[in-house]
């Protein structure tokens, strides 16, 4: 056993060494000197990612308009939270409000499960016909600690239900629900859980690959639309929860602007100084519209 383990370690070391050599001697010389991949490569990659040809210039302009629209909604919502408050000041008010705080991962799991169950119960028979198999979802605390939230679909026979997983950082013990109700709707119902579980349940109408296949543009597009839909249906009337929705949507719109603008070498927004994209302009967009710790932005 010891000999086999040592041989396996040596083999792995050799493979890593050969990979490093190939990257430095074969791949690195082919790399471009600029951060931008260029519009041709980006167009090809976006087609694979979204599933259709994207007019990148048009989408870039849409992203800038969407970012401005969301920022205006954030200002209006900040005024509802505390008259005269800026967006960041309103978020600080929400962070300090005990009404939006949960302590401990056990309480977080209960809150997540209750919100997901409530959404399915209230949507079923009113706005959606939720298949019986899809009416159950499990809220889980993930064994990892990177801070993300994600969804895993049910097994084909539903013996394993769909699950939302919350990856809680090691040092986190207090959670702010105003940011996260929209996440429950994104990952649960009417988001990914309704999306994938409904497809998997349609055994009589869809073959296996149509029930299980995933493309990011369709999959994430559904879940992002689900967040706005819940606002339209009145589930996000609370200004704190609506600010949470806007916070997440602002991040997505900012990424559209930054990613397309930088890689396709479009002119930077006027409020960022115009001209070519550079580190300072990318940082300005990120810092302004992505309310993440500085360590996550760098």
Go through each PLM region and give its residues.
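N-terminal maturation segment of proteins
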Residues: 1-290, 295
């Amino acid at each position: 056993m010891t000999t086999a383990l040592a041989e396996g370690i040596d083999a792995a070391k050799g493979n890593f060494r050969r990979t490093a050599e190939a990257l430095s001697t074969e791949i690195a010389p082919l790399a471009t000197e600029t951060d931008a991949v260029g519009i041709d490569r980006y167009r090809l990659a976006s087609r694979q990612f979204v599933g259709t040809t994207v007019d990148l210039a048009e989408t870039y302009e849409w992203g800038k308009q969407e970012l401005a629209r969301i920022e205006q909604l954030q200002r209006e919502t900040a005024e509802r939270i505390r008259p005269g408050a800026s967006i960041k000041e309103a978020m600080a008010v929400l962070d300090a409000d005990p009404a939006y705080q949960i302590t401990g991962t056990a309480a977080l799991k209960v809150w997540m499960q209750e919100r997901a169950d409530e959404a399915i119960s209230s949507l079923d028979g009113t706005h959606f016909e939720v298949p019986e198999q899809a009416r159950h979802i499990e809220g889980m605390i993930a064994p990892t600690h990177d801070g993300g939230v994600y969804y895993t679909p049910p097994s084909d026979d539903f013996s394993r239900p769909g699950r939302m997983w919350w990856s809680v950082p090691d040092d986190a013990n207090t959670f702010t629900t105003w940011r996260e109700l929209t996440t429950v709707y994104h990952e649960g119902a009417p988001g990914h859980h309704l999306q994938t579980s409904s497809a998997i349940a349609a055994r009589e109408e869809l073959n296996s690959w149509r029930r299980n296949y995933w493309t990011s543009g369709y999959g994430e597009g559904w879940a992002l639309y689900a967040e706005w839909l819940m606002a339209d249906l009145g589930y996000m009337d609370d200004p704190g929860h609506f600010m949470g929705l806007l916070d997440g949507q602002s991040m997505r719109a900012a990424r559209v602007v930054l990613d397309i603008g930088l890689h396709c070498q479009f002119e930077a927004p006027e409020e960022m100084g115009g001209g070519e994209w550079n580190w300072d302009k990318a940082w300005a967009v990120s810092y302004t519209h992505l309310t993440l710790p500085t360590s996550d932005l760098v």
